[in-house]
Amino acid sequence: MQKFDKAMLKKEIENNARKLFRRELTELNEKEAFHAVAAAIQNQIIDDWILTTKRAEEEDRKRVYYLSMEFLMGRALGNNILNLSAHEEIKEVIEELGLNLSALEDAEPDWALGNGGLGRLAACFLDSLATLGYWACGCGIRYKYGFFKQQIVDGYQKEVADDWLKDGNPFEIRRAELAKEVRFGGWVETVQEADGRLRFVHKGYQSVEAIPYDTPVVGYDNHIVDTLRVWDAKAKETFSLDEFDKGNYQKAVESANMARNIVEVLYPNDNHYAGKELRLRQQYFFISASVQTAVDSYVKKHDGDVKHLADKVAFQLNDTHPTVAVAELMRVLMDDYHLTWDEAWEITVNTCAYTNHTIMAEALEKWPIELFSKLLPRIYQIVEEINRRFCEDVRKKYEGNAEAKIAKMAIIYDGQVKMAHLAIIGSHAVNGVAALHTEILKKQELRDFYEMYPDKFSNKTNGITQRRWLLHANPELAEWVTEKIGDRWITDLSQIEKLAVYAEDKKAQSEFMAIKRHNKERLARYIFEHNGIKVNVDSVFDVMVKRLHEYKRQLMNILHVMYLYNQIKDHPEREFYPHTFIFGAKAAAGYKTAKLTIKLINSVAEVINNDASIKDKIKVVFIEDYKVSSAEVIIPAADFSEQISTASKEASGTSNMKLMLNGALTIGTMDGANVEIVKEVGAENAFIFGMSSDEVIELEHNRSYKPMDIFNNDQEIRRVLMQLVNGFYSPEDPELFRPLYDSLLNTKESDVADRYFILKDLRAYMQAQEEAVKHFQDREWWARAAILNTAHAGKFSSDRTIEEYVKDIWHLDKIEM
């Protein structure tokens, strides 16, 4: 954006009202006014967007393509205004027009392109890449309905389509001229050329057109604008008039429906074959389109020479979903650009890098050979050859022990195509996302690969963008921080450490706690508006917001709430500090245990919140449809940050970082990035409990853990567990929560009881909670510790993470603007 002109922006917004809605701005409703303003803001961004690309091309900058199934962007309007170099003037214009910026922001739906931490990390990374001045493109799918909109009906999660695009997205630009063909099914014929080389011809395939939609990613106050490119799918032939005229109405639109299915939802239920096939189809669809575009764009700028691609292009594979990129890049280089296998392989390995986000075996994707080879016949041929050559390398390296190694390391084995193995073998760099996670990968899950390729492995601890999670989400605290230490923290979070000197300052403590109270009041209003529950602003706001999964142990949290309720009922005479438990979580549609846990939380809430005898000492709140925009209200208000995953199971976590930055204290296990948070802030300013990762791994190996011993020997825990099956929280169906009870205590041969050691850690968790509540009542101690948490969050900026990727993996140079 060049010199900012307030009068021109004002006029443009008014003109947009007429152009888009044929009415005056004053006559528009909130949603319409949002579109009029957003279109004008997009116009302010365009010049910088074009100039960024122009400069990057002139300077021949290397570009990173961040390939991810998810981008959990939140809303764009407020973020774009904040990052623009003229954000104060823009706010003034909006107010002078009689509009309310926060109401306009609320009129924008959250972008339904992601679900959990994986997608939010990708969004934070894009913000950091643009702010740091690197040339980047995020590549994903333009989901029509996203993951789902969560409704809570009678305490149960109900999944409803999230039709976020129904009014259009004013920040996206359709780039039909850059459409790519993606092929599915069919077969491959081998043709020998005159020079003896083999050519592979894909025949009988279904063709889908991938159409890119580009949205701007605005760097903070630096005129750099990167791109998020998401792909829409369209059949080559959308309508068969011939079939229609014959009365075959379904068949007439069959191709169109097949293409449309690819982009309908994020993570379709894969409990059945059709769902599995659709997931693989989605992954290949956006990867093929993105890889083709990246290679073609590079070749066009470099006089048709593809051999130095790795010098100017980097593909970062965000988890296992995009790992088919390894084989697709090989296909493009060999089939479209006629390179030899060895030439193509060297380029591919040097271009691709893989981030592992989990040690959970079920999350490391595998595809049945029959499905993979049928849907992607040419890609399967390439994967077979990569696997054959890799197995040969293993045989040479481990002569005496080769077959045992191959059984553990092959890409294709036991009827499955293992995508994490393809990613590791086909990348020059493999990273974990927290120090503990990376060590577990090297010593446990990926040990054989680490032995073979030690130089590929490194750690890149995750981070968050302070611009979204402090400057935007908590403007009052952000202003206070700037008043104390200046504003350099906005682009260099290490500066926030300077706040530590204010931790003992009584005036600063009182200011900090007043800001926290204002944020709690805002959240209390939100809860009353959305849940109809009145919460005590002076109570502890105990927050657990994250995907619902057994290893994250939301169940342990609610069991503790049930225990507290019993204590209050048994001892009404005891002093008990008021406590508000706040949950936000979505469960995958096919994940029965997770969905039943949501029902339990809501059933417990129903009983406790309606029991007048406990005088509001406990309240339980489940925030429906947890998303970025609700996180921006919840996180600044939190007192306790619940990070209670089974040690060794959480790769990193990022809600722990967001909550820490906003002055919440961690109650958690030594897992994921918690380990590094405790190192930064000091164990005395957090509440750590439970087994270590080594202890968990040891118990898993020796299988000596017997949860029934706890049931038999701890009367209070036994009582809580019995309330799951005696109808206490479900009088209409006493057996409703039996599956949760069984998961904790079932000792049938086929099952492992209490797989995530909830009962093993429960007593320690209760003690940590008690300790935290005791400290919370010492307001001076708490204020000091809260300020120190904010002050020591500097390491956890995604800016730091990105600079590590740049230095060790991508080797990018900044764009000079």
What are these regions (language model features)?
Residues 1-817:
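A conserved ligand/cofactor-binding region detector
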